[in-house]
Regions:
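P-loop/Walker A phosphate-binding loop and immediately adjacent motor/lid segment at beta-alpha junctions
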Residues: 337
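Catalytic core of bacterial c-di-GMP phosphodiesterases, primarily the EAL and HD-GYP domains
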Residues: 311
């Protein structure tokens, strides 16, 4: 994608086996080869997923070490991601590393170009600890990235005079990628200045706006579902918007705004949200059942908060889905294996509450407000954890019995 827009990128080839890696290195025929793990996460270098090889033997050794390895980085979570492919890339003589990205600044309501001389590092850490090291250029969407803005950024990053025009051109090309491919993020980290005074993208990350993919079949063709969270992929197939957050309190909500507010209120009251799950505005009982299946597949989940405001959705339809889910999960016994708190408001709410009340589902509790529901589910999760902890502790040995004369038996 970057090459299509005129950006310089090191030559490289994908490798799925150790032998592929060696053959790719032979094709490159360069004294230095970089072996890179290909996973959808940053921080690979710190986790041992990027190695520099100076011979074919080292390429073979590093490929054998990395392929099949589970890399754990700041972006993968504690479970990590398994490496199933590599990128074998030609090395280059680096003079200096930089950071460059384009993204939408929601507060400024425009695209912003961000640059830093602290390239190759975790930019979030740089922004938190040294915000003065990050330069910004706000871009008028009608004009686009102006030449003077690109050159001002290049000078601000202290590019050598001989490379200023090349750096500015690089920025213009990356902006064209961002706009042309409907990106939500176009990031090059590091963007490097080589000893030959070329400006190249040594590593890059592109995020795309899902709602525009219909006009980018080339991007859709590159999608690798194996790199995606399988529950998130399953949810998408069911018409659900699901994001795994790794906590123990699951939530099911209609509407992205209400879902974010629900996640926030769980966190604010001391809970740990397990997911963001928006069932949308066209929910059916079958969709609610599918949502429950996805949530319950997460073994970390200890409680569920359902927060529904009926508008397009009908509360009675949601309630029917909850009843069906309880029957399915309990094999017809009308109970949930973990506490489920339900807060219903809006369209057909009285009918929805009646359906839940008459179903007599064990482990199902009503709530009249979002905060009450959050507090209740957190309390029940903590009580369950305490019971499990007490059950796991070994019983104290019984005290020795005494005879009438006081002798111990």
């Amino acid at each position: 994608i970057l090459r299509q827009y005129g950006l310089h990128v090191p030559e490289g080839y994908p490798a799925f086996t150790v032998e592929d890696a060696v053959q790719s290195a032979k094709r490159l025929d360069t004294p230095v080869v970089v072996v890179k793990a290909q996973i959808h996460a940053g921080g690979r270098g710190e986790a041992g997923g990027v190695k520099i090889a100076h011979s074919l033997d080292e390429v073979r050794q590093y490929a054998r070490e990395i392929l099949g390895k589970t890399l754990v980085t700041k972006q993968t979570g504690p479970k990590g991601k398994k490496v199933t492919r590599l990128l074998i890339e030609a090395g280059c003589h680096i003079k200096k590393e930089y950071y460059l990205s384009f993204l939408v600044d929601r507060q400024a309501e425009c695209i912003v170009m961000m640059g830093s001389e602290s390239g190759g590092m975790d930019i979030e850490t740089v922004a938190a600890e040294h915000p003065e090291k990050i330069l910004k250029e706000y871009i008028d969407p009608v004009i686009g990235l102006a030449d003077f803005q690109a050159k001002r950024m290049a000078y601000g990053l202290h590019f050598e005079q001989v490379a200023v025009n090349k750096a500015a051109a690089f920025m213009k090309y990356l902006y064209q990628v961002f706009v042309g491919k409907d990106c939500s993020l176009a990031e090059v980290n590091p963007m490097v200045l080589t000893q030959e005074n070329d400006v190249i993208a040594l590593d890059a990350k592109l995020n795309f706006d899902d709602s525009t993919l219909a006009r980018h079949p080339d991007i859709v063709a590159l999608r690798d579902v194996l790199e995606e969270d399988q529950k998130e992929a399953q949810a998408a197939r069911e018409g659900l918007n699901y994001v795994n957050l790794g906590g123990d309190v699951a939530c099911m909500v209609n509407g992205a705004g209400l879902a974010m507010a629900t996640v926030d209120i769980i966190k604010e009251n001391g809970g740990d949200p397990a997911n963001f799950l928006d069932v949308g505005g066209d929910s059916t009982p079958e969709k609610i059942v599918a949502a429950f299946r996805i949530m319950m597949e997460d073994n970390q989940v200890k409680g569920v908060l359902i927060n529904i405001f009926g508008g397009i959705n009908k509360c009675d339809v949601i309630a029917e889905g909850i009843v069906e889910s309880a029957a399915l999960l309990s094999e017809g016994k009308a109970e949930f294996p973990i506490p489920v708190i339900v807060r219903l408001e809006g369209r057909n709410v009285e009918r929805g509450r009646e359906i839940l009340h008459t179903a007599h589902i064990k482990n199902l509790y009503p709530a009249t407000s979002m905060e009450e529901g959050a507090i209740r589910v957190i309390q029940l999760v903590k009580e369950q954890e305490e019971r499990e902890k007490a059950a796991a502790e070994p019983a104290a040995p019984a005290a020795p019995a005494e005879t009438a004369e006081g002798e111990v038996k």
